[in-house]
């Protein structure tokens, strides 16, 4: 299988904002390499050992629990009040204290009720717009990022999930009946549908292609439940399958250049089937097509032993640490009930354990707290009341948790002199920090800083270009030696510090280090005092 590979040779520009940025040279070794020991034997250096923080929630990008919401009629306007006073097996808790993201999943017609009219615009006051603002404002107040999925297919729904203006413009589609209600869905290969949907996604990206606010955008919005399976094409067969996949994947990759995009690695991706054991090679090829355009991966049937089985596990293994994984459980307590016994589960506590175990096997970065309009039942309630230990265990062990257990730095240097620093990094989580996805393009880097001893602000920053955070996986520490000159550094007393910076934001801290002590308010890890002569 051809895996996506990314080579980044970027020159770091010098930015004099709050600090002077200086680059140097470095070399590295895996920790189990015997040559590593020589990297620590540096005259004039002191070796600083760091204790890890293993349990605290870290709101680092693309990891953690995803809190599900929505903008349909089932969403209550007091959602945040209910979730801030949520029942758990250990008493009342605030759900946001355990999550990193609010996931807003909704009908295209709710996001875009009229042509050119969107619920994020000022003055739009539909019920979905009111719910949307409530969720977005509440997320901001609680330090959560946003994530989105759009659904265009109306099957199993009680109203049209594609806006009426699309049908009125002449898009072709089909009718189905949900209960006593007839609903209409467009054919995904219809050119008018594609034109209108492309305009919606373009306008959405103009607003939300912003990693400071948005965690990810998930799926194509096509097929049953928006999960990219059971599609119905105008041809009556799967002939348009490849062309439609090429169209929508290229469109999203072009629009979302800064925010991760995610595709469901479904065995029937973009086909007319919901489940099938044939044609798996073609499905794999289509998923790879998306991966190679920069898509990350998700699946929506974790814990369901039929719909997530050997093929899904095998495909996930081929992409392990090449793309991050987001999981969603498949079983729904309110609708599936006793069906879980067919998978060998006696109750939903066992379902939660099954989902957790499957997620760990796939090295997922994010797990789901799905929504139910009755907060006293459903998946989120189940996690917090029958498996609260697993909620906390995922925070401690899932995703990525990065820290340098050992750093060798000089305690006395001369201005303009050469510095040699050895540093070793570990990942305590089972996932990985996906700096190799094109939307990030290795923007997160290791940096060392000379901090002002009074303010603890960086005066000089030195970015080590060589380490790739995506290479740090559990059980495989990475050691590096970084050499640079203190050209232009004024003499004085400073504090050595290390941080994981965002090079697109003037080297501000971008990822929290998982250290127990010694972190500044901004996230720099203090190492030792240093005198520059």
What are these regions, as identified by a protein language model?
Residues 2-14:
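Bacterial N-terminal signal peptides that target proteins for export
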Residues 396-533:
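Extracellular/luminal regions of secreted and cell-surface proteins that mediate adhesion/ECM remodeling
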Residues 102, 204, 217, 423, ...:
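Conserved, mostly hydrophobic/aromatic
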Residues 40-85, 140, 218-226, 230-376:
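Catalytic-core regions of glycoside hydrolase
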Residues 352-409:
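Catalytic cores of secreted or luminal carbohydrate-active enzymes
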Residues 3-6, 19-46:
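Bacterial Sec-dependent N-terminal signal peptides
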Residues 91-176, 241-260:
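Aromatic-lined substrate-binding rim segments of carbohydrate-active enzymes
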Residues 173-238:
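Active-site groove signature of glycoside hydrolases
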């Amino acid at each position: 299988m051809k895996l996506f590979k990314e080579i980044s040779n970027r020159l770091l520009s010098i930015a004099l904002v709050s600090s002077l940025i200086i680059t140097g040279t470095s070399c590295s070794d895996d920790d189990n390499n015997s040559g590593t020991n020589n990297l620590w034997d540096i005259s004039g250096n002191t070796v600083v050992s760091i204790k890890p923080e293993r349990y605290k929630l870290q709101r680092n990008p693309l990891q953690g629990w995803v809190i599900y919401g929505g903008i349909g009629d089932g969403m209550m306007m007091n959602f945040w009040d209910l979730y801030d006073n949520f029942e758990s097996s250990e008493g009342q808790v605030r759900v946001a204290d355990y999550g990193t993201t609010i996931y807003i999943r909704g009908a295209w017609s709710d996001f875009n009720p009229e042509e050119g009219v969107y619920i994020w615009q000022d003055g739009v006051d539909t019920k979905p717009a009111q719910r949307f603002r409530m969720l977005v404002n509440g997320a901001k107040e609680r330090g959560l990022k946003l994530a989105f999925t759009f659904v265009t297919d109306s099957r199993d729904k009680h109203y049209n999930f594609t806006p009426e203006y699309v049908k009125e413009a002449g898009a072709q589609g089909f009718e189905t009946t949900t209960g006593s209600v007839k609903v209409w869905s467009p054919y995904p290969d219809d050119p008018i549908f594609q034109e209108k949907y492309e305009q919606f996604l373009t306008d959405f990206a103009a607003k939300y292609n912003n990693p400071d606010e948005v965690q990810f955008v998930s799926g194509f919005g096509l097929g049953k439940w928006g999960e990219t399976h059971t599609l119905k094409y105008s041809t009556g067969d799967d002939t348009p399958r490849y062309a439609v996949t090429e169209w929508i994947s290229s469109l999203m990759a072009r629009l979302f250049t800064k925010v991760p995009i995610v595709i469901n690695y479904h065995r029937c991706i973009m086909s007319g089937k919901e489940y099938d054991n044939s044609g798996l090679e073609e499905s794999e090829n289509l998923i790879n097509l998306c991966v190679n355009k920069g898509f990350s991966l998700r699946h929506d049937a974790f814990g369901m032993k039929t719909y997530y089985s050997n093929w899904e596990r095998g495909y996930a293994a081929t992409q392990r640490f090449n793309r991050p994984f987001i999981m969603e459980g498949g079983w729904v307590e309110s609708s599936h009930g006793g069906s879980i016994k067919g998978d060998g589960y006696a109750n939903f506590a066992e379902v939660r354990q099954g989902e957790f175990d499957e997620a760990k096997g796939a090295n997922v970065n994010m797990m789901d707290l799905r929504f139910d309009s009755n907060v006293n039942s459903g998946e989120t309630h189940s996690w917090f009341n029958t498996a609260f230990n697993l909620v906390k265990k995922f925070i401690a062990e899932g995703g990525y948790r990065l820290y340098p257990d050992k750093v060798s730095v000089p305690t006395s240097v001369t201005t303009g002199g050469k510095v040699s620093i050895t540093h070793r990094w570990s990942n305590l989580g089972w996932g990985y920090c996906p700096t190799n996805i094109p939307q990030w393009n290795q923007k997160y880097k290791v940096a060392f800083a000379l901090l002002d001893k009074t303010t603890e602000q960086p005066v000089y920053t030195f970015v080590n270009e060589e380490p790739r955070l995506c290479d740090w996986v559990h059980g495989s520490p990475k050691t590096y030696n970084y050499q640079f000159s203190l050209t232009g550094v004024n003499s004085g007393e400073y504090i050595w510090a290390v941080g994981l910076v965002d090079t697109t934001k003037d080297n501000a801290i971008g990822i929290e280090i998982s250290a127990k002590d010694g972190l500044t308010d901004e996230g720099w890890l203090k190492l030792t005092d240093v005198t520059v002569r």
